[in-house]
């Protein structure tokens, strides 16, 4: 049995921020589970401040590379 999480839609504001900061390619290079987890994590924020903080963390990790949800990770071999 394979467990699958529901695919998260890309919010317009996040797509715009990724484009503005030229991080869309870094986002797209991540494995599908990471992209989906980032969006689900951001969507679960109850307060606007929390959502903003999570978006900022995602952007920082994409810019730095080799970091996912505060943990080191090897880049995928695409």
Residue ranges: model-predicted function:
Residues 1-78:
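Charge-dense, helix-prone N-terminal extensions
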